[in-house]
Amino acid sequence: MTEPDVAGAPASKPEPASTGAASAAQLSGYSRVLLKLGGEMFGGGQVGLDPDVVAQVARQIADVVRGGVQIAVVIGGGNFFRGAQLQQLGMERTRSDYMGMLGTVMNSLALQDFLEKEGIVTRVQTAITMGQVAEPYLPLRAVRHLEKGRVVIFGAGMGLPYFSTDTTAAQRALEIGADVVLMAKAVDGVFAEDPRVNPEAELLTAVSHREVLDRGLRVADATAFSLCMDNGMPILVFNLLTDGNIARAVRGEKIGTLVTT
């Protein structure tokens, strides 16, 4: 399952946010969020799981939940399998995508375990039925879990090949009535240029969906982005590797890049 990266380089300090409606929205904070995590980060750059990384993410999420915010999570599976890459090696695309979906379930179960060690009741819901390890994806049940203060992790992507976990994040956010998609990356946000090419590239702190589209800036894959743009769902792109950034994002502090209609 493909997950485009935001163009970026090693993290740098975010620039001051520009004024306007997007900044005003960011300052208001959020009560229900959909957190999108890339699978590669769970592996610490390697194949498999890095327990230290998963534990650090779980601690950040637990702090947010204890503050009364409802949080759902979508995790990629790139630390195990990436369907598009396996296809390039000759594997049939639909089969490789299903392998990627199973990778997201492994990540979901790992995060559930570390969250419950933090004392946070967590439910995993999967788009592919696997009753021994997770609930089936039922949006009304997911909302009920959130209202009870539980974390809900959505695994197995959309349950369909050719759809990325970015698209899953956008669709799930809309269906559960989230205020925002928090797109956690290994970079500070969205840049005007690729910082790997231009180290002085400007970090954009607030842009519109239309501007992202017109300028060809990479935030999420096209399907995910279209869903968010058409339905007015804001996306906040921020650096997960900075400890405490999930809580800062939820509080509406000026970090990363806020994309609004």
From Swiss-Prot:
Homohexamer. GO terms for biological process: 'de novo' CTP biosynthetic process; UDP biosynthetic process. One of its GO terms (molecular function) is magnesium ion binding. Its EC number is 2.7.4.22. It is found in: Cytoplasm. Catalyzes the reversible phosphorylation of UMP to UDP. ATP binds at residues 36-39, 78, 82, 191, 194. This is Uridylate kinase. It is an enzyme of class 2 (transferase). It comes from Mycobacterium tuberculosis (strain ATCC 25618 / H37Rv). The modification N-acetylthreonine is found at residue 2. NCBIfam families: pyrH_bact. Keywords: Acetylation, ATP-binding, Cytoplasm, Kinase, Nucleotide-binding, Pyrimidine biosynthesis, Transferase. Pfam families: AA_kinase. The gene is pyrH. Pathway: Pyrimidine metabolism; CTP biosynthesis via de novo pathway; UDP from UMP (UMPK route): step 1/1. HAMAP family: PyrH_B. Its main location: cytoplasm. Belongs to the UMP kinase family. Inhibited by UTP. UMP binds at residues 77, 97, 158-165. It catalyses: UMP + ATP = UDP + ADP. GO terms for cellular component: cytoplasm; plasma membrane. InterPro entries: AceGlu_kinase-like_sf, Asp/Glu/Uridylate_kinase, Uridylate_kinase, Uridylate_kinase_bac. Residues 1-23 are annotated as: Disordered.
